[in-house]
């Protein structure tokens, strides 16, 4: 029931955006002096019951809303249109400023039947989209007639009416309409008829840019092209055949583009997603292509070989060639990477070996450190179970702290030993998402600890994904299906994880974070002194922990983020160098290595220190921005400052937050270095000002932690199998 409610909320939000978009476009039409009293909106999906009130509200503004398929909706639009032109745009998509006006001006200047422009695909909202970069990467420049090579280039990838401005009287005169017998390819016959009938009267303006926006939530809100649809090949062939009946021998450019479209379709889908009985039909279509030699020139040598064999009807030969070609592409060459070869052993040998329920596979931050909740769960297991289990730690470099613990095995990330143990261990403990290829076997118990109470929006709560893979949400969903348990530190996190990860609430362990157990240790003062000694921090100095996070829109590559040190360390050294030091801790995603030699004796770099929880104990004050470290640091009830120099931009445009930072944080938001310096001079006053808010914050986010989270988690997760109560089918 809760899952359906969440999906309903997502649909509600999407419908509301569509209605707002329709209303805005009507206003834009008025501004361009287009006529028409009302707009009716037709949608391609059934509406959730909770939309009824929403639709009543918008009905007064834009007319009525009906649920029908895409082709039917477009035909209704053509029937209801009253203006001089009709124009097609999806509600998820958007235009470069002036794009529609350029098409209108061009149509009137050239007396054109149809005008269009460049199309560019993107995953981002307009606020995060680089229009200038997109304009440089489009293939049509300037104003040209839509014919010859320009027509071929424009339509070889897809026949779509998006970004077409068409004279309405021409549509009515020739009774153009969309094919309602097909769900996915209704544009094909419409486009071919239009392009044929309007030949010589069509123009394209390369500076008129249309952005086709992909949807990055394929679980809740898939676009039509992203929906699970089985095999489309039969429907595509039907649409292709209908187009052939429209095209005449003299329509060479149209035929070339259509044939190229079919070749691309076959190449992408065969053999997995083309029904066996349809494959010979594709072969026959290729054999009848009049410009076969020109079409096939666009492909590489291996692709040409496979397509040529297919064209001759030798499908039994074509299938292995196609598989080899796709395998070669996936391997990025004939040899491939080592991990890809290790996975061959995984599939054919390792996963056929018995599962070891007494082996525990442990990974923290992709093998970068012996740290976080996996560390404390492991140490509790060593303390209470000892050699009853074999512990396999994923760690790329040696760790002195790990070496001092009990018996264990260390493996490097993505090594052969990594693949072997990952295939056979009966337990997995991770604090980040697992590799997509590393799928667990039946009977494995997967404990996902996660790595912090979220401040920044996660997964399905995010709109644009600016730095991770655009399949981020789909991958996240698939990964979550493998987790048997997910740890939460508080009710707030439980609510977020259930929604953002689309995860069953019953499997969330709201037990507190094991990594915070040390913050309640009886010997925490001794640990703090030990940490200072390890880092060379002088005794008696006030330790200011500076722990900034990464920015979603500043990155080199996926998982490798840029970092600009915004805090003026030189000024802090001048103001506080006599009695204070700065302990710098950057996020594990940050790729930049900072040169701090000029601040020697004042700034201590703790970014490579394995366990951030130990750094908390050594710190008197925490300065952060949007990092979740303050949720954990607050367990110590020590002062926290928030240096958020880009607060307005970050909160509103980059990722968004789960809380109202200005009203709920347990410390002040400081936007300038002057404000930071002033705050550090008046810490007593700040602590008094934020005392009540800090207490409320602690109760909301820290009250579950008490130093025994590791015990609760281990006795639940491992105790179930030990007591014979584990549901192995979960």
Model-derived regions: residue spans:
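Glycine-rich, basic loop-to-helix element that forms the pyrophosphate-binding segment
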Residues: 51-56, 62-81
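Donor-binding/catalytic cores of nucleotide-activated saccharide
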Residues: 70, 93-231
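Short aromatic/hydrophobic "clamp" motif used to bind/position activated sugar donors
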Residues: 86
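Membrane-interface aromatic/basic loop that binds lipid-linked glycans or pyrophosphate carriers
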Residues: 272-353, 379, 383
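Conserved catalytic-core segment of nucleotide-activated headgroup transferases in glycan assembly
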Residues: 369-385, 514-596, 670-672
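A donor-sugar binding/catalytic signature common to diverse glycosyltransferases
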Residues: 428-457, 609-654
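A nucleotide-sugar donor-handling region in carbohydrate enzymes
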Residues: 455-556, 693
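Catalytic binding pocket for nucleotide-activated donors in carbohydrate/polymer assembly enzymes
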Residues: 597-601, 628-701
């Amino acid at each position: 029931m809760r899952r359906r409610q969440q999906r309903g909320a997502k649909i509600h939000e999407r419908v509301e955006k569509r209605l707002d978009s329709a209303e805005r476009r009507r206003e834009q039409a008025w501004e361009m002096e287009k006529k028409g009293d009302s707009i009716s909106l037709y949608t391609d999906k059934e509406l959730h019951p909770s939309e009824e009130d929403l639709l009543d509200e918008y009905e007064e503004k834009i007319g009525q809303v009906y649920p029908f398929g895409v082709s039917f909706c477009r035909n209704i639009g053509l029937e209801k249109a009253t203006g001089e032109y009709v124009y097609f745009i999806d509600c998820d998509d958007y235009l470069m400023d002036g794009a529609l006006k350029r098409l209108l001006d061009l149509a009137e200047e050239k007396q054109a039947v149809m005008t269009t422009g460049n199309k560019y695909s993107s995953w981002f909202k307009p606020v995060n989209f680089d229009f200038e970069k997109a304009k440089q990467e489009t293939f049509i420049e300037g104003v040209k007639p839509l014919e010859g090579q320009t027509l071929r280039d424009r339509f070889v990838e897809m026949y779509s009416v998006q970004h077409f401005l068409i004279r309405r009287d021409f549509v009515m005169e020739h009774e153009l309409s969309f094919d309602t017998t097909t769900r996915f390819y209704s544009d094909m016959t419409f486009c071919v008829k239009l392009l044929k009938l309007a030949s010589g009267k069509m123009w394209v303006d390369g500076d008129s840019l249309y952005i086709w926006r992909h949807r990055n939530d394929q679980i809740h809100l898939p676009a039509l092209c992203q929906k699970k649809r089985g095999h489309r090949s039969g429907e595509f062939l039907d649409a292709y055949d209908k187009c052939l009946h429209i095209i005449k021998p003299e329509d060479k450019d149209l035929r070339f583009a259509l044939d190229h479209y079919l070749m691309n379709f076959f190449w992408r889908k065969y053999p997995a997603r083309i029904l066996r009985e349809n494959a010979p039909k594709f072969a026959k279509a290729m054999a009848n292509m009049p410009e076969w030699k020109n079409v096939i020139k666009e492909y590489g040598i291996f692709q040409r070989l496979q397509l040529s064999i297919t064209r001759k009807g030798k499908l039994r030969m074509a299938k292995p060639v196609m598989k080899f070609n796709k395998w070669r592409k996936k391997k990025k060459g004939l040899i491939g990477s080592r991990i890809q070869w290790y996975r061959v052993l995984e599939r054919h040998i390792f996963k056929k070996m018995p599962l070891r329920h007494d082996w525990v596979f442990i990974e923290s931050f992709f093998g970068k450190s012996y740290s976080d909740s996996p560390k404390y769960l492991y140490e509790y297991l060593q303390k209470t179970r000892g050699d009853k289990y074999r512990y396999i730690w994923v760690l790329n470099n040696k760790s002195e702290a790990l070496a001092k613990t009990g018996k264990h095995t260390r493996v490097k990330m993505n090594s052969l030993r990594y693949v072997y143990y990952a295939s056979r261990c009966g337990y997995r403990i991770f604090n980040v998402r697992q590799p997509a290829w590393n799928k667990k076997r039946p009977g494995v118990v997967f404990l996902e600890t996660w790595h912090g109470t979220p401040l920044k929006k996660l997964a399905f709560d995010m709109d644009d994904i600016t730095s991770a893979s655009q399949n981020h949400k789909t991958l996240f969903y698939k990964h979550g299906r493998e987790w048997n348990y997910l740890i939460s530190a508080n009710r707030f996190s439980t609510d977020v994880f259930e929604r953002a990860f689309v995860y069953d609430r019953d499997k969330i362990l709201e037990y507190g974070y094991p990594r915070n157990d040390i913050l309640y240790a009886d010997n925490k003062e001794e640990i703090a002194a030990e940490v200072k000694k390890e880092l060379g921090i002088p005794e008696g100095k006030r330790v200011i922990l500076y722990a900034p996070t990464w920015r979603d829109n500043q990155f080199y590559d996926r998982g490798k983020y840029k970092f600009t040190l915004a805090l003026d360390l030189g000024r802090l050294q001048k103001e506080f160098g006599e009695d204070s030091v700065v302990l710098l801790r950057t996020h594990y995603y940050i790729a930049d290595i900072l040169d701090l030699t000029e601040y020697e004796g004042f700034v201590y770099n703790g970014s490579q220190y394995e366990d951030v929880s130990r750094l908390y104990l050594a710190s008197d004050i925490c300065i952060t921005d949007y990092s979740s470290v303050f949720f954990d640091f607050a367990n110590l009830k020590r002062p926290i400052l928030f240096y958020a120099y880009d607060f307005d931009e970050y909160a509103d445009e980059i990722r968004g937050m789960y809380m109202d930072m200005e009203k709920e944080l347990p410390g002040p938001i400081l936007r300038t270095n002057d404000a930071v310096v002033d705050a550090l001079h008046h810490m007593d006053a700040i602590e008094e000002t934020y005392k009540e808010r800090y207490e409320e914050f602690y109760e909301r986010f820290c009250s579950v932690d008490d130093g025994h989270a590791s015990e609760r988690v281990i006795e639940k997760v491992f105790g179930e199998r030990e007591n014979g109560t584990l549901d192995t089918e979960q």
